Amino acid sequence: MTINDPIADMLTRVRNANMVRHDKLELPASNIKKEIAEILKSEGFIKNVEYVEDDKQGVIRLFLKYGQNNERVITGLKRISKPGLRVYAKANEVPKVLNGLGIALVSTSEGVVTDKEARKRNIGGEILGYIW
């Protein structure tokens, strides 16, 4: 089965695993998914990320993070730019998510970065999604 929107598939898998409080999840690997996974780790939304090479495209293994009383660290994920309706923002129009409590994933000419990093580097791009 082919996946038309692999980023939406990744966000949906994370959302579903988070809702049922799974410790880890696996998804097919790609370069953009690896960049998104590294951002999730650096921003503290997940514990760890592993890359497993196989004879096909490889697998990304994400280890989800929960609070002391098993509360979710990721409370929401939303895909913004979709294959049928792309959403772009200039450097001065990159949105803040919940007044800075969440992050926006921005695909730029320098790779996938957070909204804070895009504003700091003064670059715009495609708004992939929001995570809070």
UniProtKB/Swiss-Prot annotation:
One of the primary rRNA binding proteins, it binds directly to 16S rRNA central domain where it helps coordinate assembly of the platform of the 30S subunit. GO terms for cellular component: ribonucleoprotein complex; ribosome. It holds the Pfam family Ribosomal_S8. Part of the 30S ribosomal subunit. Contacts proteins S5 and S12. PROSITE patterns: RIBOSOMAL_S8. Gene3D superfamilies: 3.30.1370.30, 3.30.1490.10. This is Small ribosomal subunit protein uS8. GO terms for molecular function: rRNA binding; structural constituent of ribosome. Keywords: Ribonucleoprotein, Ribosomal protein, RNA-binding, rRNA-binding. GO terms for biological process: translation. It comes from the Bacteria. Belongs to the universal ribosomal protein uS8 family.
